[in-house]
Amino acid sequence: MIQITVIQIDNYGPWTVTPNPRRESDLQALQSRLYADLNLMFGAHKGLVFYTRFDNLIAITNGIDLITHKRIQESIRNRYPFTVSMVIASAETPYEAQKLATETLQEYGSAQDENRKEVLDVANELVVDGYVQIAHIDINNITGTLTDIVSAYDTYLNVNKVKLALMEELLKYNALLFFIGGDNFMAPSNGMSEEDFLDIFNRINKKYKIELKAGIGIGRTAEDASNLADIGLEKIRGKLVDKNVCTLKQDDFLESKMGMGKIYHPQF
């Protein structure tokens, strides 16, 4: 089971134009700061936040309880000129979890309802003994094939084409995908196999002539899974595996490191 928290700024659209439209540069900076602060706050508890549309964010929050969510919510109220609402849900797949959380939040009223403030609810249950699977996907040799050859905007356009293709393909497996900068994407993907990813990569390569690779991490929290995914991706880059996917599981990884005589102090 994966635990997802949907985060939404309360009544944000009307606030941006009241009493007059606010400077766009200020709004962009404010949204970026909120994303950064939320990642730091949830990250302190081994969670991970993705910005989606900036006024609506999705966080992977396995291991994070309701009290911690409440404290984060209060901290945002104290730091920002607006409030946020949060709903937590769990499911076998990321898409199912975020959908359930979203539907529960919508039951409290519109995102632009001035009377709906600081909703905090659990749609079904908090995850006690679940896991997180995250794939860190990137484009093979984007520097040599795009960055150093075509314009900055054309590279950006191609990256977004790949992003959309990945989002549509992964949705067939009830997985999610988020852009995380450069040519990198992260996909919460509980239940997917390496073969599923290879099939998707082959279809995208046939259509766009772009090769992809992915480290896949499976851990108890978003931080554990994403760290393992990063290590798996480095194994592919270092040609330590013979295919474009590499899966690392938390317990297996810790056992292999301990067996090499290294001392680890995992925080579970």
From Swiss-Prot:
Keywords: GTP-binding, Hydrolase, Magnesium, Nucleotide-binding. This is GTP cyclohydrolase III. The gene is gch3. One of its GO terms (biological process) is biosynthetic process. Catalyzes the formation of 2-amino-5-formylamino-6-ribofuranosylamino-4(3H)-pyrimidinone ribonucleotide monophosphate and inorganic phosphate from GTP. Also has an independent pyrophosphate phosphohydrolase activity. It is an enzyme of class 3 (hydrolase). It catalyses: GTP + 3 H2O = 2-amino-5-formylamino-6-(5-phospho-D-ribosylamino)pyrimidin-4(3H)-one + 2 phosphate + 2 H(+). The lineage of its organism: Archaea, Methanobacteriati, Methanobacteriota, Methanomada group, Methanococci. One of its GO terms (molecular function) is GTP cyclohydrolase IIa activity. This enzyme couples pyrophosphate hydrolysis to the guanine ring-opening reaction. GTP cyclohydrolase and pyrophosphate phosphoydrolase activities probably occur at independent sites.
